[in-house]
Regions:
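HhH-family (HhH-GPD) DNA N-glycosylase catalytic core used in base-excision repair
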Residues: 1-215
Length: 215
């Protein structure tokens, strides 16, 4: 168990921001929120009351994985000051609705796949499809509490044919990206090294990877 104080972070706002699909709300009462998060092969329970957070991991795991995941080295207070002193009323209004949102530093492969699933979809359906993909691929997290996100080569072929997964027309695109990444194991590492424009073009080369999703 590890406790920490963090300003400018709201678990509920992050969970509902549409950037992550492996957060499960465990509890919400008396202004306390608790979520389970699966990422990087780990499973974390995290609760929040005000700016106080309690986590199921120890300090070493927090510093090794979750600190960077929650982007704690970025000064969101400074960003807030710039927004609040700007002349942009639309930006101020948007910030007032999501002042606790942080840009999560998620696993690149998970983002590539989940945002393909997100095309022309809604958050509850996306979340369900991602949950089923992880469960039916059967790769356990390190502590055995849940399922890790399947890497290339870890998804049984029949999953792409199973209509109950909710992939719809996206099933063929998912099959293609999994096969491509398995056949080209350096692709993700090379993608990380590219400029924004080159990375965008590389993603758009993949089957039906739309610009909005690639971005």
């Amino acid at each position: 168990m590890y406790k920490i104080t963090i300003d400018n972070m709201d678990l509920k706002q992050i969970a509902e921001s549409g950037q992550c699909f492996r957060w499960k709300q465990i509890e919400e009462k008396d202004n306390t929120y608790k979520y389970n998060i699966a990422a990087f092969g780990k499973s974390l329970d995290i609760s929040q009351k005000g700016n106080e957070f309690e986590l199921s991991c120890d300090e070493a795991e927090w510093n090794a994985i979750w600190r960077d995941y929650f982007d704690l080295d970025t000064d969101y207070g400074q960003i807030a000051d710039k927004i609040n002193t700007s002349d942009d009323d639309h930006l101020k209004l948007a910030y007032s609705k999501g002042s606790g949102v942080r840009i999560l530093k998620q696993d690149l492969w998970e983002m590539v796949v989940t945002f393909m699933i997100s095309q022309n979809n809604n958050i509850p359906r996306i979340t369900k499809s991602v949950e089923l993909l992880c469960e039916r691929s059967g790769i356990k997290t390190d502590n055995g509490k849940g399922y890790a996100f399947p890497k290339p080569g870890q998804v049984p072929e029949e999953i792409f044919e199973d209509r109950s997964m909710g992939f719809g027309y996206r099933a063929d695109y998912l099959r293609e990206i999994y096969a491509f990444a398995e056949a080209n194991p350096d692709w993700l590492d090379n993608l990380r090294k590219l400029s924004y424009d080159d990375a965008m073009n590389t993603l758009l080369e993949r089957k039906k990877k739309k610009k909005k999703v690639a971005n």
